[in-house]
Amino acid sequence: MSETAPAASSTLVPAPVEKPSSKRRGKKPGLAPARKPRGFSVSKLIPEALSTSQERAGMSLAALKKALAAAGYDVEKNNSRIKLALKRLVNKGVLVQTKGTGASGSFKLSKKAASGNDKGKGKKSASAKAKKMGLPRASRSPKSSKTKAVKKPKATPTKASGSGRKTKGAKGVQQRKSPAKARAANPNSGKAKMVMQKTDLRKAAGRK
């Protein structure tokens, strides 16, 4: 009898299923969404634009919009914001409305706001000048005091040397004068002796 080979199993073994990783992939630093730049504050740009105008009657709304557009502000999208900012600044007393009513008309800075801007500019210019000058005056004062202290000792020896010369000169004059006086005294003493001798001889002759 012929041997029969065992039949191959028809059942298939299922392949292992990979489980999805529970860890979330971290975002790359380069792909982080860039933040939108903050918009310009209209309440600050409007006073700056009005400070540049030299018109006494103020700046009209159309001219103000041109100045804001030149500064990089989107006037068309933010038209309503400009009008609201103008009303707020007028109510606060920062701006004065010279013509028109509401947001339409001409505007200019009030005296208080103008004086505040001038003071700020003066402080900035003073600080810039101080930086250009370099060291402050307080740091320069020790150098001047050192130079004065060095000059004073030099002046004192000159006075002492002058006085020394005067004393030496006076002593030399006295020494020179003293021999002359001695010589002048010696002849007088010799004459006195001769007179005494003559008187003695006369007396002796008279006695004889």
Curated annotation (Swiss-Prot):
A Pfam entry, by short name: Linker_histone
Gene3D superfamilies for the chain: Winged helix-like DNA-binding domain superfamily/Winged helix DNA-binding domain
Biased composition annotated in UniProt, kind: Basic residues: 121-134, 143-154
Assigned keywords, A-Z: Chromosome, Citrullination, Developmental protein, Differentiation, DNA-binding, Nucleus, Phosphoprotein, Spermatogenesis
Tissue expression notes: Testis-specific.
GO molecular function: DNA binding; double-stranded DNA binding; structural constituent of chromatin
One Gene Ontology term from the biological process aspect of the record: flagellated sperm motility
Phosphothreonine: modified positions: 156
List of residues that carry Phosphoserine: 9, 141, 163, 178
Coiled-coil positions: none
Positions carrying Citrulline: 56
Function text: Testis-specific histone H1 that forms less compacted chromatin compared to other H1 histone subtypes. Formation of more relaxed chromatin may be required to promote chromatin architecture required for proper chromosome regulation during meiosis, such as homologous recombination. Histones H1 act as linkers that bind to nucleosomes and compact polynucleosomes into a higher-order chromatin configuration.
Protein name: Histone H1t
Organism this protein belongs to: Mus musculus
Gene name in the database record: H1-6
